[in-house]
From Swiss-Prot:
Ranges for region Disordered: 1-30
Physiological role: Required for the lipid transport activity of the ALA/ALIS P4-ATPase complex.
Gene: ALIS3
The name this protein goes by in its record: ALA-interacting subunit 3
Residue stretches spanning the membrane: 50-70, 305-325
Organism annotation: Arabidopsis thaliana (Mouse-ear cress)
C-alpha cells in the first residue's frame, strides 16, 4: 500500500515537473512562418529567362521614354535671367550696395515668343543657389500661429523674426520674412497682359494651413526688411504669394508660381516686361530668372524622365543582345547539380 502511494506520488511529481518545464520553455510555438518553412519559388535563371526579361523591360521603357520626350518637347518655355542685366553698368561692381540702396529699381525686358503658346501660360520666378532646405530656415515658422489667432503668441521657433517691441509678428519666422518681392508687369503691343494671381496656391494649404481669420500684424516692421510686405486687411488664407513661398523647396534651384496668363501668345510676339528688381540675391551669389511656360499632360518641360526611361531601356536591350550573342557563340552548361565534378565522377578527386 505504501509502495503504491510512493509510486503515485513520484508519478505526480514527475508529471508536475514536465508540465512546469513545458510552461517555462522558451521554445516558440511551431509555425511554418517562424520556422521559415513557407512555400517558396526559386526560379532558375536560364539564358532564355534572362534574355526575355531584359527584352521585355527594354520594349516597355524605350517607348515610354520616347513618349515622355515628345511630351516635354511640346512644352514651350521662355526663360530670361535678369539679375545682372537689371543692374546699371556703373553699379555692377557693388551689386549688394545697389540693391540695398534707395531709389527706383525698375527694369525693362523684352521676351520673344518663338512658338505659339496656348493658355494657360504659367509665370514663374526661378531662384538659384537659395537653400530653402537649410534646417534653421525651415524650422523658423509657427504653423499653429498661421492657422489660428489663439496661437498668435506661439513664436518660440521663429527667432530672430519673432516679435517687434514685445508684440508678436504675424506671420513670424525667417521664411515669411524673406518673401520674394520682385514684381512683373507684362504687355504685348502696348496692351497690358493680365496675370491672374488667384488659384496659384494649393487648395489644401489655403483651407488647412492658413487661417481665414488670421491677419498680418507687425510684419516687416523690424530693423531690417527681408522681402515683400503683406496687406494687413487680407487674411493669410488669401495671401497666395505668401502661401506659395511658405512651401519650401528641397533643392537650391527652384521655381515658384507667380501667376497665370489666360490668353494665347502667338509666334513672333514680343512680350514687354516691366519688373521691379527688389529681391536681394546678390549677397549669396544667387540668380533670378523669369519663366513663361505652357504645360503638357505630363507637366512642365522636363527631359529627365524621358532620358531616364531611354537609358534604362537601352541598357537592358544591350544586355539582352550581349547575352544572346554569348549564348549562341559560347553556350554555358546549365547549372544543374548533375554537372558537378563529384557527381559526374564519384570516385575521383
Amino acid at each position: 500500500m505504501s509502495s503504491n502511494t510512493a509510486s503515485s506520488s513520484a508519478g505526480a511529481a514527475g508529471s508536475g515537473d514536465s508540465s512546469a518545464a513545458r510552461k517555462n520553455s522558451k521554445r516558440p510555438k511551431y509555425s511554418k512562418f517562424t520556422q521559415q518553412e513557407l512555400p517558396a519559388c526559386k526560379p532558375i535563371l536560364t539564358p532564355g529567362w534572362v534574355i526575355s526579361t531584359f527584352l521585355i523591360v527594354s520594349v516597355i521603357f524605350i517607348p515610354l521614354g520616347v513618349i515622355s520626350l515628345f511630351a516635354s518637347q511640346d512644352v514651350v518655355e521662355i526663360v530670361d535671367r535678369y539679375d545682372t542685366e537689371c543692374i546699371p553698368a556703373p553699379a555692377r561692381t557693388n551689386k549688394v550696395a545697389y540693391i540695398q540702396g534707395d531709389g527706383d529699381k525698375v527694369c525693362n525686358r523684352d521676351l520673344k515668343v518663338t512658338k505659339r503658346m496656348k493658355q494657360p501660360i504659367y509665370v514663374y520666378y526661378q531662384l538659384e543657389n537659395f537653400y530653402q532646405n537649410h534646417r534653421r530656415y525651415v524650422k523658423s515658422r509657427s504653423d499653429s500661429q498661421l492657422r489660428s489667432t489663439k496661437y498668435e503668441n506661439q513664436i518660440s521657433a521663429c527667432k530672430p523674426e519673432d516679435d517687434v517691441g514685445g508684440q508678436p509678428i504675424v506671420p513670424c519666422g525667417l521664411i515669411a520674412w524673406s518673401l520674394f518681392n520682385d514684381t512683373y508687369a507684362l504687355s504685348r503691343n502696348n496692351v497690358s497682359l493680365a496675370v491672374n494671381k488667384k488659384g496659384i496656391a494649393w487648395k489644401s494649404d489655403k483651407e488647412h494651413k492658413f487661417g481665414n481669420k488670421v491677419f498680418p500684424k507687425n510684419f516687416q516692421k523690424g530693423n531690417i526688411t527681408g522681402g515683400a510686405t503683406l496687406d494687413p486687411r487680407i487674411p493669410l488664407s488669401e495671401q497666395e504669394d505668401l502661401i506659395v513661398w511658405m512651401r519650401t523647396a528641397a533643392l537650391p534651384t527652384f521655381r515658384k508660381l507667380y501667376g497665370k496668363i489666360e490668353s494665347d501668345l502667338e509666334m513672333g510676339d514680343t512680350i514687354h516686361v516691366k519688373l521691379n528688381n527688389n529681391y536681394n540675391t546678390y549677397s549669396f551669389n544667387g540668380k533670378k530668372k523669369l519663366v513663361l511656360s505652357t504645360t503638357s499632360w505630363l507637366g512642365g518641360k522636363n527631359d529627365f524622365l524621358g532620358i531616364a526611361y531611354l537609358t534604362v531601356g537601352g541598357i537592358c536591350f544591350i544586355l539582352a543582345l550581349a547575352f544572346t550573342i554569348m549564348y549562341l557563340v559560347k553556350p554555358r552548361r546549365l547549372g544543374d547539380p548533375s554537372y558537378l565534378s563529384w557527381n559526374r565522377n564519384p570516385g575521383g578527386r
